[in-house]
Amino acid sequence: MDLAYDGAAFAGFAPQPGRDTVVGALGEAIARTLRLDAAPFIVGAGRTDAGVHALAQVISLDLGAAVLSEDSTDWFLRSLNHQLRGRVVVARARVLDDFHARFDATWRQYRYLVATGPALAATSALAWAVAAPLDLAAMNDASACLVGVHDFRAFCKRAPDKTPDEPLLRHVYEATWTDEPDRLGVAAAGGFVVFRIRANAFCHNQVRRLVGSLVAVGRGELVPEEIAARLQSGDARRLPAPAPAAGLALVGVGYDDLHGGPSGPGAPIR
């Protein structure tokens, strides 16, 4: 299933007892629609944090004895979207065997918006408002070192089960900043800069921590070479704070056309 949602309304994607989450809201709607005794187990391609949006999240779930045929997916979508009332929008549902939204994904793409112009006061739910001028050339120089396979320990929030010296290897395919309009019209009116990053996977807080440091480069608070040096050393001490969640959105998930499976937008968002 392909989803979109405004992350400001949720405490995150993954279920949390006593808190409103994307999985919680969606699971309840599915259970009501199919008259299940309990919400199904839902797997997402990306586990977005509180406040992080998604334009192209992909999920998989096993409905067990509740058989949903390809012919009934339109009814299923209408029922879910009616119950969710725009909090989560389900764009597509397909019946596939052995599809796993997380483990079958070959890449994920995130986009981060920074508001730099007249729209600063009106964009707090969608972008990070940064009043200082930003040097995009320096930010792109700093971003170039991210492409390839690297240990991102310096730019990730370490999970409790990971030791401090354990590498967090991720393969980044692209990482660029632009002030040009993208396919969704973002930045078309000016006053925005857009960071796009695509990788095989991301560790916790990785994009927001990278953006926080790259914006510091754009402000002249860090030199571009500092990003490469931190990748090499793994040292996170005295790095800038992570960028706010509001500017971040999951905008694409790619699959190698497994079983004709979903692929988010089908290509990286431009």
Name each region found by the language model.
Residues 1-270:
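Structured-RNA-binding interfaces characteristic of tRNA pseudouridine synthases
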